[in-house]
Structure formats: structure tokens, C-alpha cells
Amino acid sequence: MKQYQYSPLAPNRQIRLLKLCAGTEAEKLSGELVHVFLDEKPSFTALSYAWGDSQPRKAFCCSNLKMEIGLSLHSALRNLRQPTCDTLLWAGALCINQHDISERSQQVRMMSDIYAAAFATVIWLGEESSDVKMAFGW
């Protein structure tokens, strides 16, 4: 499978959103990155999470092309995926071309606007553990 290549964003407040394909827990994660203009007020959920270590990485199928994402993002997407309908998400590690310094700088400057425009923001703390249960068991 060929490696995913980012296509450039328009300079006027365009962002990428991940259209995460519906699926069961047994199915591999897949989706596509779509370009939208923030000023057109698309309905999406923003994802905030700790990126964690850059290695190891997990496979992600983006527009039928290969992409690798961090374990924390993979875990978050697996838990946010719906069984019967696609989900529109923004996650910086995936929706911003991290290898394009100019784009990354421009998109980081827009992050407060992106989070403000989101229908909801999900904060991913990681997989459930006994420590998490204890923290929320007050």
C-alpha cells in the first residue's frame, strides 16, 4: 500500500478534518482527510490528547493509503469510532501536516479558533485503568 501524501491547504483558514469511518472494534481503523474552511462552520469534534512517545506507531488507512499514527491517537480513534456512522474529527497530529513547517506554524496559530469552532471537544486521557477509576471515584 502506498504512503499517504498530504495535499496543500488553501491559505484562507482552511483545515483538514478526519472523516473516521464507522466500524466495529474488530475492524481496522480507516478514514479520509477532507479539506474544509473554518469560516463555513463545519460540525466536528475536536480531540485533545497527550501525543505520548513517537514510537512505536500503528497503521491507519487514510483514503486507502498507508499512514502511521501514535499509539495514543490510535487508542482515542478506536474508542471514538461509531459502529454505524462516520465521525468528523479534528486531531492536530493527523489533520496538520507535521512535516510542513510553514503549514504547521499557520495551523498552530489557528488552534484556539479550531477548538472554539468545534461542536464538542473530547479530552482523551488514555485507556481505562484502575488509576483512572480511582481518580474519578470521588
Regions of interest found by a model, annotated:
Residues 1-90, 96-106, 127-138:
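Metal-dependent phosphate/diphosphate-handling catalytic cores characterized by acidic Asp/Glu clusters
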Residues 124:
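PIN/NYN-family metal-dependent endoribonuclease catalytic core
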